Amino acid sequence: MTVDVIAHIRTDLTDKFGVPRQSGLVPELGGTIVLEPPYRNPDALRGLEGFSHLWLIFQFHRAARAEWSPTVRPPRLGGNRRMGVFATRSPFRPNAIGLSCVKLEEVRLDEKLGPVLYVSGADLVDGTPILDIKPYLPYADCHPEATGGFTDPLSAQKLEVSCDPALLAGLAPRQREALLGVLACDPRPRYQDDPERVYGLSFAGKNVRFTVEKGVLTVLAVE
């Protein structure tokens, strides 16, 4: 089977560190989906504007491995417990393919690079290859009774973020909210809990440095 890359997504997250662990956790985090030339046909998007959300099937292009392991160590479990790869959304899979549900903000047909999709809530690093786009169907895709296995106790955990507003002056308003949301999701590996350690992530061309102590993330610099 041959799989073609139909598009790439542009986001403000240029490194894996800081990317939300699931889609929808940071609704303010925007993304732009640019189709590859063979697929820049407005007819391919006809009717898409009627859907509020989309499924993106994508490639974990920064997580390719020559061999796969039947078990992985989910970061949310502290990195010291193993789970079956098919019981996780780890990027280290037999086939490096992921699934992300995003909100469709706008479809623009008159962009220079052809039809462009503006989305929000993506959990994808800048430049991620998109393999397919499908509409989210509430009547079929929503299961309120679903359970989340070992992830249920972890889903609501967030950090308090302390940040001087002046540090965010170089970002657009929505980017400020997105960055604060990314930080609140605690980008650190669970096994790292040194209050003296200074962490850094790249966001919208800025180097963001911060510390975490007793559930509070303090932003030191955005430069």
Predicted regions and their residues:
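Conserved positions in beta-strands of structured domains
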Residues: 10, 102-105
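Mixed-charge, low-complexity intrinsically disordered regions
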Residues: 1-97, 109-118, 122-223
